[in-house]
From Swiss-Prot:
Primary role: Component of an amino-acid transport system.
PANTHER family the UniProt entry points to: LEUCINE-SPECIFIC-BINDING PROTEIN, PERIPLASMIC BINDING PROTEIN OF ABC TRANSPORTER FOR NATURAL AMINO ACIDS
UniProt entry tagged with the keyword Transport: yes
Protein known as: Leu/Ile/Val-binding protein homolog 4
Gene source species: Brucella abortus (strain 2308)
Keywords, ordered alphabetically: Amino-acid transport, Signal, Transport
GO biological process, one term: amino acid transport
Taxonomic superkingdom: Bacteria
Family: Belongs to the leucine-binding protein family.
Amino acid sequence: MSLKVFLQAGVACAALSLAGAAGASAEPLKIALVETLSGPQASTGLLYRAAVLYQLGKINEAGGFNGEKIQILEYDNQGGPVGAADRVKAAIADGAQIIVQGSSSAVAGQITEDVRKYNLRNKGKEVLYLNLGAEALELTGSKCHFYHFRFSPNAAIRFKTVAQGMKDKGILGERAYSINQNYSWGVDVENTVVANAKEIGYEVVDKTLHEVNKIQDFSPYVAKIQAANVDTVFTGNWSNDLLLLMKAASGAGLKAKFATSFLDQPGNIGNAGAIAEGHIVSTPFNPEANGEASMAFAEDYKKVTGHYPSYVEPAAVFGLQLFGEALKNVKPGEGKINTTDIALAIENASVKTPMGDYSMRSDDHQAKFPMVVQEVSKKARIKADGTEYGFLPFKTFTGDESIDPVQESCSMKRPG
């Protein structure tokens, strides 16, 4: 089944669910996907959509919640905070008790604040926000609150594991450079890279923050990196800022390895080709990392959606697996949805995903799960973007090994 057909089927199922629940006595659980579904960043939003429909479809196949199919509502946030704010209001007006989103930390910052403020004004009618992929540290730091849960890594998790994995393999070296986009995510990455240097055993000899998606020629930046004589380049760059940086590095003959967070974004390997070989990424999934379990998931996901899970999809699926497990422990409350009970159940839930043990830390609502450090290689079983290259895993960290400490800035007020 193609992704297009699958998505159309998912929308149809959601519509049927809406119709079927109309006469039911129990209040249906409505989940609103508030995601970037149009515009230049829609490719990532559509991946989240595929993951949400895949896993919520699994939950509905198993009986849904409280004897009813979960209703899936969709709203296009158009890639920005203003659009997201409007769509969250619309979703709540339409009866959604849970908001899901992932493809932008700026959008996530808007949504989490909107949800927090709404909940303060509407005691007993609180809305949950399930963050599938926005990774800014502040979301589980200064902006943490009881009704927000993050199911993805953050900068601290990604760059601790990628550095330690490279160190353990003997490919990190001693001298490192940090180059990142100049906004919250890039600053988080730079701070993490610097903070980890002494413990893991490398020196950050220089660092750069640059404009986001405005630079066409990274040659001057690469010249600066080359002059620093480094072994590893840490970068949280994504999209063209990653591709153009790596192409400029290859053109200049830079020998340093790139330690990245988003090298697995669809299209990156297709565009970079041989330039990407040997470079490193740390993510929550690799189909070869956990034997039959991880490969079986990859094949099932492809069967349903038309493509192998990659980039943001696995983390979203695994997070919703935990959510589904939590729902099993929520008792019906006189036919009404109680999101506080659901939130408490998520805090206490654990699940065995295709990558291993997955749980939620109650202190700040940061999920805990394995991370896989992997390199671009021709030896990978599943190839990326129709090329001869894929991602070959060489180090897996458990959730306990991967997760970062609770940030001091998180002061979560609990209900009651």
